[in-house]
Amino acid sequence: MSLTRLNIEAFRNIQSAQLIPAPGINLIYGQNGSGKTSILEAIYFLGMGRSFRSHLSQRVINNDDDKLTLFATLNLARGDSKIGLRRFRSGETEVRIDGEKVKRLSTLAETLPIQVITPESFSLLFEGPKSRRQFIDWGAFHADPQFYGAWTNVRRVLKQRNQLLRNGSSYSNIQFWDQEFVRYAEQVTEIRNHYVDSLNELLKGIIGEFLPSVDVKVSFTRGWDSKTDFAELLENQYSRDLATGHTVSGPHKADLRLRVGTLPAQDALSRGQLKLLVCALRIAQGKLLKQQIDKHSIYLVDDLPSELDAQHRQLLLKQLTDTGAQVFVTAIDPAAIVDSLHTPPSRMFHVEQGRVTVIE
């Protein structure tokens, strides 16, 4: 899978741009503030319906416009597919895939799987369990068609249960919801656990190349003691949950733990090693997607030269090239990327003040 055409209108400082990307490595270069990261952000927005730089999606709309428009042609195994997205300043989002209106943004993610490696990727290790759950759930969503339904039901039942707790409801009123909660929680947990087991098999080899002298252990924690029956736990913790006004244990507390010896990876590794660990996780996830559903991710790599030294840039770019996936990588100085590649980039784009030029 690859993007063969990308149109961007009124997205940040890009008033209008059309790119014809190539399979393989697409290098986008320009000075800070030129708009090169905005191209990556636009691709991500098209695949996720939101930005990886801001939680306020209206901010990505150009100041002179009331809406942004993104359009892409995808080359898929079954043929070409066309995706269009409009985001209005009012907050409304309009999505079409092959001319048909799409109601769920999850359909975008299913159609256009994206991996992002940016200077902010450290959030995966430092921001607490939520970002790591999202990492697991991205893979579980793509790997198992049952996951999304079970996950949305967990969220629905958990919301209802927490509302009852805040209202001071008796356990007899909560028990019905607990039966549903247990059923969907166990389904989500089984899929997550299986996914992490599969990821681990690939991850060992990639971490071995990036960090050959470091033994990183990766494990999944479900959000409650695995030796305890979840239904019993919910009943036994009712008084505690009632006092706090929310459900203390469950799949919403799951985590992906990375340890070196007895220490969390973020305490045991240097900043440079942690960068490589995050890169390894993203590459492993993309490779596993290809194995499981025969679909490539698209990789968006922002400001690579500032994040890794020359040796590790070369190693990362080799790993990305070996995936066979389409890659978009940004840099201020194109030589920093070109010199780290074994072969020239498939295509190069220069960005200046929001204007994009292909370099022949």
UniProtKB/Swiss-Prot annotation:
It comes from Shewanella baltica (strain OS223). Gene3D superfamilies: P-loop containing nucleotide triphosphate hydrolases, RecF/RecN/SMC, N-terminal domain. GO terms for cellular component: cytoplasm. One of its GO terms (biological process) is double-strand break repair. The gene is recF. This is DNA replication and repair protein RecF. The lineage of its organism: Bacteria, Pseudomonadati, Pseudomonadota, Gammaproteobacteria, Alteromonadales. Its main location: cytoplasm. Pfam families: SMC_N (PF02463). The RecF protein is involved in DNA metabolism; it is required for DNA replication and normal SOS inducibility. RecF binds preferentially to single-stranded, linear DNA. It also seems to bind ATP. GO terms for molecular function: ATP binding; single-stranded DNA binding. Belongs to the RecF family. ATP binds at residues 30-37. It is found in: Cytoplasm.
